[in-house]
Amino acid sequence: TILSHFMSFMGIKTQWLDVRNFIKTNSNYRDAEVDWELTQATISKNVKKKMLNITQGFLGSDENNFTTTLGREGSDYTAGIFAYCLNAESVTIWKDVPGVMNADPRYFENASLLSHISYREAIEMAFYGATVIHPKTLQPLQKKEIPLYVKSFINPMLPGTCVSKGSDSEWQIPSFIVKRDQLLISLSSIDFSFIMEENISEIFALFHQFKLKVNLIQNSAISFSVCVEDKFGNFKDLNPILSKKFKVDFDENVTLYTIRHFNDKAAQTVEQNKTVLLKQVSRETMQIVTKEK
């Protein structure tokens, strides 16, 4: 409301929209799901397309008009919701970085800007831990092929990154995603019996119960390894339960590196001067769990 009143004071005609009257959700207050049909109808009816509309992000309301929130990166998601409902030409979100980088400059001194990536690549990067764009923001835009521009509010004249429809073969520069303070857990069967689906299902149920977020999985006939985020320090309580059925080995304070479109040089960059505890490779992605020597 402050921005709206200021712009009106400056002679710029605006319409203030309390977003809670427009984005309708269920009652999961901290991570609400959007009622798209009702939201679309409300936004389409009330937003004046030839006027500057100002609203807030992150919020919605349920069927009883109680305030809800949209979860992590909810403000960016709000922009995506309005763009979808209004069939916008594009969306721009403003960050404290030049755009989407191929690596975090804090950890990689030669990090470079990705000027153009596909929706698919952006969602893959977000899944593995990149924090600039949340997948929820991209999903409604991808459905209607609305381009997303990620730009810097510190240097607004920089070109930033465009996320849009395109072939993933266009961007093959390796991208590095880093997750620090991880916990690597290795479970082995005590009697050399196979670790089967029912064992894995039980393990995952325990991880969910103790709020451990799984970021990597690797299994063999008689062992099962996971790299997890123990944000609440619950592994100390989970370990005795797991130890009743499995031999438990674990390494604390490890780092998980994910390399999209990896090559030998990229892998060497990550592994240099580190102890590699686990490595997993697929067609486009390499994940490496390391510990400092």
Residue ranges of model-derived segments:
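A conserved active-site cap/scaffold subdomain adjacent to cofactor or substrate pockets
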Residues: 116-164, 170-172, 180-182
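Short hydrophobic alpha-helical runs that function as membrane-insertion/retention elements
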Residues: 90-94, 148-150, 215
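Electropositive, surface-exposed helix/loop patches at the edges of structured domains
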Residues: 47-62, 125-149, 186-200, 251-270
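Short phosphate-binding/catalytic loops that engage adenosine nucleotides
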Residues: 12, 146, 212
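A conserved regulatory-domain signal marking ACT and ACT-like small-molecule sensing domains
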Residues: 159-293
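Flexible loop/turn segments at secondary-structure boundaries
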Residues: 24, 61-63, 100-101, 156-159, ...
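Nucleotide/pyrophosphate-binding catalytic subdomain
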Residues: 1-133, 138, 291
